């Protein structure tokens, strides 16, 4: 029996991880705790083998004046909770970092992450995550494993990220550019299985899980349109507009540039692919607008 405490109650990732682990109650006992106002200090950490830390401020293109808050929550709070966990006998601390520690691509050049690629954040969200990682590694020892996950974009039912926006567009536009690309993505159930395997195998280190298949914006649009019975014409005639739009609209590079981990970085001695990419898009909610 592995006793797991999730710090960050009611988060999209935390809630899904909890549900996934609780499918096997004979193997996992899971509790959650809020990290607001030091409520987490009231939890008895001595009961737990693993802390899965998901609390943090998300990447939402924040204003510069919010930078101190990002460092306080994403870096300082993370390290404080990890120290507390170590002092109270927790054996493994799993931290949800982000692929954005490498770079937040803002042009059509995109970014391809190799095993040799070094982190180089270009905004304070990525830097706050990287500084948290560095602080955690200083705490690692033989009796306290640090597991850092740098996921690409996570999605799934109930998530309000960019994918539901793209779904809305796919069901409204009559035409779409045939601009194919490669993007690493991670369905929340594949992430949940990955976290489960980290706990079972008691693995420390830095990890780069992703879906077994790269996402392609064109194919995502095609699948959404098909599922919702919407006819759409995908044509290369619109491709020049992608280049033009990328110069003025930040959303265009996010939608059409390449952004992925090479596959070898995401291969481990266990299988965590529980849902295919095409199946993972079925039944996803779409937004009522692009906002």
Regions found by a protein language model. Name each.
Residues 194-252, 281-291:
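Mid/C-terminal beta-alpha module of Rossmann-like enzyme folds, strongest
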Residues 79-124, 147:
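Conserved Rossmann-fold NAD(P)-dependent oxidoreductase catalytic core, especially the SDR/UDP-sugar
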Residues 4-21:
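N-terminal Rossmann NAD(P)H-binding glycine-rich loop of SDR-like oxidoreductase domains
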Residues 63, 168-186, 190, 194-197:
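A conserved pocket-lining segment of Rossmann-fold NAD(P)-dependent short-chain dehydrogenase/reductase
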Residues 37-87, 101-104:
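NAD(P)H-binding glycine-rich loop region in Rossmannoid oxidoreductase-like domains
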Residues 72, 107-154, 175:
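Catalytic helix-loop patch of NAD(P)-dependent Rossmann-fold dehydrogenases
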Residues 71-78, 94, 128-129, 184:
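Short alpha-helix in the Rossmann-fold core of NAD(P)-dependent oxidoreductases
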Residues 152-159, 178-189, 211:
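Glycine-rich "substrate-gating" loop/helix at the edge of Rossmann-like oxidoreductase active sites
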């Amino acid at each position: 029996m592995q006793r797991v405490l999730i710090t960050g109650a009611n988060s999209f990732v935390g809630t899904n991880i909890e549900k996934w682990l609780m499918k096997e109650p004979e193997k996992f006992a899971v509790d959650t705790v809020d990290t607001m106002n030091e409520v987490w200090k009231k939890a008895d950490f001595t009961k737990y083998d693993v802390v899965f830390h998901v609390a943090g401020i998300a990447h939402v293109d924040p204003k510069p004046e919010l930078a101190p808050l990002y460092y306080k929550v994403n870096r300082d709070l993370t390290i404080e909770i990890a120290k507390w966990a170590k002092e109270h006998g927790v054996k493994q601390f799993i931290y949800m970092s982000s692929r954005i520690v490498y770079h937040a691509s803002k042009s059509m050049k995109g970014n391809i992450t190799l095993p040799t690629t070094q982190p180089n954040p270009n905004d304070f969200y990525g830097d706050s995550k990287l500084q948290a990682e560095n602080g955690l590694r200083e705490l690692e020892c033989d009796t306290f494993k640090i597991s850092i996950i740098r996921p690409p974009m996570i999605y799934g039912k109930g998530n309000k990220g960019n994918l539901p926006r793209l779904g809305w567009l796919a069901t409204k536009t009559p035409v779409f550019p045939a601009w194919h690309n490669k993007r690493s993505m991670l369905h929340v159930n594949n992430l949940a299985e990955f976290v489960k395997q980290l706990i079972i195998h008691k693995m420390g280190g830095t990890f780069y899980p992703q879906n077994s298949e790269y996402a392609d914006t064109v194919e995502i649009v095609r699948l959404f349109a098909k599922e919702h019975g919407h006819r759409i014409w995908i044509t290369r005639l619109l491709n020049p507009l992608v280049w033009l739009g990328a110069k003025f609209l930040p959303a265009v590079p996010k939608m059409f540039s390449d952004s992925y981990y090479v596959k070898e970085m995401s291969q481990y001695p266990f299988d965590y692919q529980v849902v295919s990419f095409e199946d993972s898009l079925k039944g996803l909610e779409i937004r009522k607008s692009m906002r």
